[in-house]
Amino acid sequence: MDKIIGKQLPKKDQDNEHWVSMSDLMAGLMMVFMFISIAYMHYVRIEKEKIKEVAVAYENAQLQIYNALDIEFAKDLQDWDAEIDKQTLEVRFKSPDVLFGLGSTELKPKFKLILDDFFPRYLKVLDNYQEHITEVRIEGHTSTDWTGTTNPDIAYFNNMALSQGRTRAVLQYVYDIKNIATHQQWVKSKFAAVGYSSAHPILDKTGKEDPNRSRRVTFKVVTNAELQIRKIIQE
């Protein structure tokens, strides 16, 4: 009879065969998960390396732009009462008495003379780094004060309109400088006039606002490093 229907394995042997099959299955799954983990870690490492490369390139470009600006304008900064921020790539004009009249958006004659000298040379420096530049912002900043009111909200929005009007006036003035005509298209595509009101005051050593230093105009280069990193993440 055993030869006809086959010999049935004892229950103990059946259980052993079952566990061997299960252990083989689990081992196979573990191998699959291990390969997935290795592949994912490899992918993450590659992405980190890409981001690191962009960060290094950003730092190099940032330093190169700063050095080029510093070499170009080092001898003029004191006369202009200006400074260049290495971290933000801002050329900061700090003397409000030279820039505009109180509550006015009209550029003072001395500021116009400074811009006549500064802006064509500024564009010449940036020419060498166009591939790294996303935007150039002309930023206007005010103090928190506003003559005629103690209401901080009214002062804020009045200063917002003032700072926006001033940066627009600066952009329009430099755009019309005769010897930058060949750069006008690039200026239109990259430059923005931004008024921040009193949102970014300059503080003194005690942590209080320095109203005089808070009133300023800056030219700020924004590089494309952040955009490149965002593209890597999205991919």
Curated annotation (Swiss-Prot):
UniProt cross-references to SUPFAM superfamilies, sorted A to Z: OmpA-like
Q: According to its UniProt record, where is this protein located?
A: Cell inner membrane
The processes (GO biological process) annotated in the record are:
defense response to virus
The answer to whether the entry has keyword Cell membrane is yes
Alphabetically ordered keywords of this record = Antiviral defense, Cell inner membrane, Cell membrane, Membrane, Transmembrane, Transmembrane helix
**Domain OmpA-like: start-end pairs:** 87-225
Show the InterPro entries listed in the entry: Bact_OuterMem_StrucFunc, OmpA-like, OmpA-like_sf, ZorB-like_t2
One GO cellular component, as annotated: plasma membrane
Q: What does this protein do?
A: Component of antiviral defense system Zorya type II, composed of ZorA, ZorB and ZorE. Expression of Zorya type II in E.coli (strain MG1655) confers resistance to phages SECphi7 and T7. While most T7 infected Zorya-containing cells undergo abortive infection, a minority produce viable phage progeny. These eventually accumulate to a high multiplicity of infection, leading to culture collapse by 170 minutes after initial infection. ZorA and ZorB probably assemble in the cell inner membrane and exert their effect there.
What NCBIfam families does the entry give?
A: anti-phage_ZorB2
Name this polypeptide is given: Zorya protein ZorB
Encoding gene (name): zorB
